[in-house]
Regions:
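Conserved positions in beta-strands of structured domains
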Residues: 6-10, 76, 81, 95-97, ...
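Hydrophobic core residues within well-ordered beta-strands of beta-rich domains
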Residues: 3-5, 90-91, 104
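Hydrophobic beta-strand-centered segment that forms part of the acyl-chain substrate-binding groove
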Residues: 52-91, 128-131
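Short, hydrophobic/aromatic-enriched beta-strand segments in well-ordered soluble domains
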Residues: 21, 93-96
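Compact, glycine-rich, soluble single-domain proteins
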Residues: 31-58, 69-72
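HotDog/MaoC-like acyl-thioester-processing domains
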Residues: 14-16, 85-87, 95-149
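Catalytic strand-loop segment that frames the active site of acyl-thioester-processing enzymes
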Residues: 1-40
Length: 149
């Protein structure tokens, strides 16, 4: 199952991306998280940062040789803050840190944009994470190719 957690790319440079996700009650994962107090699940906030980070890395010249999709390799120092309720938007900013051997070290922060709010937007989640190419054995790759044809 795939959830697209990037509605719009607001800014994109080789070192930074800013995206926006509008959260609505139409999102199927909100139906039971939680029934009487719907909020965006924390793992979906992290996934929004991962999807933004993936777009950032894939837009760079030094990622042109990728043979496999980028996947989440590691999460560090993840901190959650404010709940994200339907009607609000999640503004995600991801910055590229070091490019390691076959890995990209990223730092992300997602803030809550509530309708009519003034002042600084509260942080929903922040942390560091690593994206790397998926590691698939040759047997799995053959099976994957047979299934997708």
């Amino acid at each position: 199952m795939h959830f697209d957690l990037v509605d719009r790319v607001l800014e994109l440079t080789p070192e930074r991306i800013v995206t926006l996700k509008q959260v609505s009650m139409a999102e199927e994962y909100l139906q039971d998280h939680f029934a009487t107090f719907p909020v965006l699940p924390g793992v979906m906030m992290l996934e929004a940062m991962v999807q933004a980070g993936r777009r950032l890395v894939e837009s760079r010249e030094d990622s042109r040789g990728l043979r496999m999709p980028l996947v989440l390799g590691k999460v560090r120092a993840l901190k959650y803050g404010r709940f994200v309720k339907p009607g609000a938007a999640l503004r995600v900013e991801v910055m590229l840190g070091k490019k390691l051997e076959g890995e990209w070290d990223l730092r992300g922060e997602a803030t809550v944009i509530e309708p009519g709010a003034v002042g600084e937007a509260p942080t929903a989640v922040s942390g560091r994470f690593i994206l790397r190419e998926a590691r698939i054995s040759s047997v799995a790759a053959i099976h994957r190719d047979a299934v997708t044809q």
